[in-house]
A protein has these predicted regions:
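A late-sequence structural motif
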Residues: 184-185, 189-190
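Terminal-tail/helix-coil boundary detector
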Residues: 192-201
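GST-like fold's C-terminal all-alpha helical module
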Residues: 96-183
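GST-like domain detector, emphasizing the conserved glutathione-binding G-site
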Residues: 1-121, 134
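Residue-level recognition of oxygen-bearing side chains
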Residues: 66, 173, 186
């Protein structure tokens, strides 16, 4: 497995996932700021030219949710995703996708101080999204009680990012949830890798 990665980007979420899964993988450094990026070769991995990208057995793809789901399903022993026959599978997929389909749009809404028509917007609106998420992660510690999943990893990463840059309100439930996620050994390992990659610049 290869993770196409650039430090100090949202690719950190996928890096964290690889450390959480605990399986062998290689990091392929991608300089998204270099002239000529994305190359045609990289667009065969991720057509949008963004990071992260992922490749396994010669097949490449992008999108954080896809990477997290692929890795979680590839290694069921990690219990990072309910198996397809598990009744919780649908709920897991809902919250795994929530970061990309809802949290990211409403964070932009918050940053830009805009309020699109919540009926027409596919993500609803900021207040409704935050309330739904707060309800989902309460009482915790994770979406499915004591079982940490890839959905928790993605949500924890998104909340941490959003609160750091003022795009998500620092509700106590969010602060506590993100802190629990960041306390995981896999997060610490990913931070160490990130620091080493930054130092290479």
């Amino acid at each position: 497995m290869k993770l196409y990665y650039c430090p100090q980007t949202r690719a950190f979420t996928s890096l964290w996932m690889m450390e959480e899964a605990g399986q062998p993988y290689d990091i392929v450094r991608v300089d998204i700021r270099a002239p000529g990026h994305p190359t045609e070769a990289y667009k065969r991995i991720n057509p949008m030219g963004k990071v992260a990208g992922f490749e396994d057995n010669g097949v490449g793809f992008g999108e954080t949710a896809a990477i997290l789901l692929y890795v979680a399903d590839k290694f069921p022993q990690t219990k990072l995703s309910p198996v397809p026959t598990d009744p919780n599978r649908g709920r897991f997929l809902q919250w795994l996708m929530f970061s990309a389909t809802t949290i990211e749009p409403v964070m932009v809404e918050k940053r830009n101080n805009t309020a699109p028509n919540s009926f027409q917007a596919g993500w609803g609106d900021y207040d409704r999204a935050m309330k739904a998420l707060e309800t989902a992660i309460t009482p915790g510690p994770w979406l499915f009680g004591n079982q940490f999943t890839a959905a928790d990893l993605y949500l924890g990463s998104s909340l941490g990012f959003g609160m750091r840059f003022g795009m998500v309100d620092k509700r106590q439930a969010f602060v506590d949830y993100a802190a629990r996620a960041a306390a995981r050994p896999s997060f610490k390992r990913a931070e160490e890798i990130e620091a080493r990659e930054v130092a290479k610049k």
